[in-house]
């Protein structure tokens, strides 16, 4: 009988027939999901000789949800993910204007998915702008709920922003706003709790995966108390909770200014194993790193709360409406995110089957259009069928 995944004593409890919700996604979501689901199902069947099976449960979000329910993110969808703990999703459209914030950000904040985890690695055969892309093998831990993504801001010229500026000037003696009459104002919250839980998760991940170096990426040279606090609290976590690992040489923790980090990932990417970043810096760095190994079409991602067990694994690219329903999209982002999901629930054998099949497909010079670069471009279904045949 199919059962929901639950958290007991800090550990996920996963039956042989777990219920896992999925959100198909908008745009190319339909093309990539129908192929990805077939690959997930076969990998599980082969890896466990038919003894395990995922019971997929479709949830609505994005344009598909709006067309059917009049809501972009139905409460039922949020509640189903809360109850099931683990879910996977395709790309979601967010309408421009109308006061509706990013659906992806809404999901992360509503479920307190504080860690955005993005493993970035190179696959042989994939075109890259780097001479030695194989040196790039970095896992990003991006804080997911704070920073400017909290959405606390006021528009220039409004009564609200005038009140904020007046308060800053009269009550806080702030005199550094260059053009107070025409400025928009935003607030950047960075908390001790938010920073420490993110950095603790990054360190735990490094130790679990036998990775030694954890690097704190920040702009503490300019923003002393927010970005600088992130750096300070990261070192505190290491000293308070991981002193034994530090003394034994199993863990090294260091830090780097964000702009220097963006240089070093090009010049010396092998210097980094796991990196922890604030939200905005993590946004920049994750897409920059993805470009080094072939682009976001092959970049997986997960949004995780390691304390509650809640996790959403997702395609990291957009909806690409220009190629929707044309069987052209690259399914690898959602496939590799699915591998992260399988690893997360302990089904590593199935994840390894898919990863290995993708590696062999690339080595055989079989690519979708975004990675072909003058070579023959394969359709989504043809590319996926090649993976299925290898498994």
UniProtKB/Swiss-Prot annotation:
Keywords: Glyoxylate bypass, Magnesium, Manganese, Metal-binding, NADP, Oxidoreductase, Tricarboxylic acid cycle. Transmembrane segments: none annotated. D-threo-isocitrate binds at residues 102, 104, 108, 118, 142. The record marks 149, 219 as: Critical for catalysis. Its cofactor is Mg(2+); Mn(2+). The keyword Protease does not apply. One of its GO terms (molecular function) is isocitrate dehydrogenase (NADP+) activity. It catalyses: D-threo-isocitrate + NADP(+) = 2-oxoglutarate + CO2 + NADPH. The keyword Membrane does not apply. Its EC number is 1.1.1.42. Mg(2+) binds at residue 283. GO terms for biological process: glyoxylate cycle; tricarboxylic acid cycle. Binds 1 Mg(2+) or Mn(2+) ion per subunit. Catalyzes the oxidative decarboxylation of isocitrate to 2-oxoglutarate and carbon dioxide with the concomitant reduction of NADP(+). Homodimer. Belongs to the isocitrate and isopropylmalate dehydrogenases family. This is Isocitrate dehydrogenase [NADP]. It comes from Streptococcus salivarius.
């Amino acid at each position: 009988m199919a059962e929901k995944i639950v958290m007991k004593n800090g550990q996920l409890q996963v039956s042989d027939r777990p219920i896992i919700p999925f959100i198909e996604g908008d745009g190319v979501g339909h093309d990539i999901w129908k192929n990805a689901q077939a690959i997930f199902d076969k990998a599980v069947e082969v890896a466990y000789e038919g003894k395990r099976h995922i019971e997929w449960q479709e949830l609505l979000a994005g344009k598909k949800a709006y067309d059917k329910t009049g809501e972009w993110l139905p409460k039922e969808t949020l509640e189903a993910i809360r109850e099931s703990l683990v879910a996977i999703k395709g790309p979601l459209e967010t309408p421009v204007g109308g006061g509706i914030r990013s659906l992806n950000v809404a999901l992360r904040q509503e479920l307190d998915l504080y860690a955005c985890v993005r493993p970035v690695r190179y696959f042989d055969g994939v075109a890259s702008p780097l001479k030695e892309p194989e040196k790039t093998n970095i896992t990003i831990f991006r804080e997911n709920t704070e920073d400017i993504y909290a959405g606390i801001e006021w528009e220039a010229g409004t009564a609200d922003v005038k009140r904020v500026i007046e308060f800053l000037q009269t009550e806080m003696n702030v005199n550094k706003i260059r053009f107070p009459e025409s400025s928009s104002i935003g607030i950047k919250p960075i908390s001790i709790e938010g920073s420490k839980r993110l950095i603790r998760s990054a360190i735990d991940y490094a130790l679990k995966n036998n990775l030694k170096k954890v690097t704190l990426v920040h702009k503490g040279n300019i923003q002393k108390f927010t970005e600088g606090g992130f750096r300070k609290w990261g070192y505190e976590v290491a000293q308070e909770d991981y002193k034994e690992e530090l003394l034994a040489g199993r863990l090294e923790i260091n830090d780097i200014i964000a702009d220097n980090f963006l240089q070093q990932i090009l010049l010396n990417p092998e210097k980094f194993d796991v990196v922890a970043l604030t939200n905005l810096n993590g946004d920049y760095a994750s897409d920059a790193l993805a470009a080094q190994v072939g682009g976001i079409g092959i970049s997986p991602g997960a949004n995780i709360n390691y304390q509650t067990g809640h996790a959403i694994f997702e395609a990291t690219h957009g909806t690409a409406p220009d190629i929707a329903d044309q069987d052209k999209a690259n399914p690898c982002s959602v496939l590799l995110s699915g591998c992260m999901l399988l690893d997360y629930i302990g089904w590593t054998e199935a994840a390894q089957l898919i990863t290995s099949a993708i590696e062999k497909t690339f080595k055989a010079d079989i690519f979708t259009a975004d990675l072909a670069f003058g070579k023959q471009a394969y359709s989504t279904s043809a590319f996926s069928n090649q993976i299925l045949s290898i498994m």
